[in-house]
Amino acid sequence: MANDQNRREAEALTALARALAASRPDMEPTLREIEGLAAAALGRPAPIEVERGFEQAARRLRTGWLRSVAAETARVLRSPTEREIERLAHSRHDAYGYERDFQPESLEARCEAFFGPAPPGWTAAHVMFSSGQAALATVLLHLGERRRGKLEVAHVGSYFETRELVARACAPARNATDADCIIVEPMACDGRFTRHDPARLARRLTRGQVLVVDETLSAPATQAPAILAEAVAGGAAVLRLVSGLKLLQQGLELANVGIVSVFATEADLAASLADGLKRCRTLTGAGLRFVDALALEAPFFLDREATETYAGRVFAHNAALAQAVMARNRRFKPLGGAGLAGAAMPYCAFELEAGNGVEGLEALACRIEDEATARGLLIERGGSFGFRGHRFEVIEPETGEPPFLRIALGARDDHSCSGLIELMGRLAQGGAEMRPRWRPAGGGLHPE
């Protein structure tokens, strides 16, 4: 079984390399290197060494692609000459007069095939930004343009940067009914996962209101069809927001990107919102840079089948982790409410039932490191989620919420994935005292 799983990862990496080499001929040397690294990894005796070989191959693939992209973009100034603009116009890339006004029309056109057409009676437009948060900030800027006072926003979710952005730029609405804009996270996490129902909010929209649905934690799956099936009032709009860095790039993190899909039953409203977002994008520099757009020309980005397969493995592995922990749990608080049954989560978040502080969580993190080393499991300290390999970190929110341990299992179905699931199930039972390699000193945590 393990050999089959390793062969699948080797084949996946070489398939990605072949796709990139087909797109850029100067990637041929990288393709040959990846083929060699993948084959060498398969020949290593220890499972952890096999996985390290795959990690090396993935990093080399990313490096080769970004080096190729950088070599091309280095030949074009950020304010190109007329001759350079003409040359770009005759290439497969989007031309631009100055980079802050770069319009990634080719990538935005690919969004319709990826996300699918708008339902009957709806018009859709897709706008890309330099990140998910840049996208949201631009949305709030544009929506507030014609308001006499501050834009009134209701935030139904947990993401701390969204909360801070709304607090800095907008006025909090007393409730969703009174809000100019409602931001909802269908899957939210602040140490515990919570589900929210955007369709219920859509039913209550009135003319002039905008519902922003942040699906970053659940992409590429979407609730848009269910939301748009509601009797949304004319003159209201629904915007879907996705950060494309996490689960849409096969774990390679080629470039930050945020995607806003604008839906309205009135074609003029959809066009006006999309055009306004694009203009604000130029004014604030919130758009993609030319080098980012070329990096995102990777054929697997916005490939529906490839993305669903990849993200599906991430969700499945973290679901298995959650189930293993909860089945034997005597150490952690519940991961979330009963409404989470069957929910897809791209990582797991754990709070200790007793003594949930940074010191206790750090002690647990050190125990995980020790046990992983003893068992030959590959997991690294680091943030975010959606990688090919596995990560974990202790998070202490700046906003005052309780700290928590995040474990983000990746897409690789490897020895470490199954081993970490088994390890966390055992640790969830409690029992043996965890002696930290860290001790409090001078108000902080310091190594022994």
Residue ranges and their predicted role:
Residues 138-142, 161-168, 193-196, 219-227, ...:
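A short acidic (Asp/Glu
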Residues 119, 143-148, 173-174, 199-206, ...:
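Alpha-helix termini
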Residues 17-24, 39, 43-64, 233-400, ...:
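Active-site C-terminal subdomain of aminotransferase-like
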Residues 154-158, 184-188, 214-217, 351-353, ...:
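Structural motif
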Residues 171-231, 237, 243-247:
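Active-site phosphate-binding strand-loop segment of PLP-dependent enzymes
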Residues 100, 128, 155, 185, ...:
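Glycine- and other small-residue-rich loops at beta-strand/loop junctions that grip anionic moieties
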Residues 137, 141, 194-202, 414-429:
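Amphipathic, non-transmembrane alpha-helical secondary structure
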Residues 1-168, 326-327, 443-447:
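Conserved N-terminal alpha-helix of the aminotransferase class I/II PLP-enzyme fold
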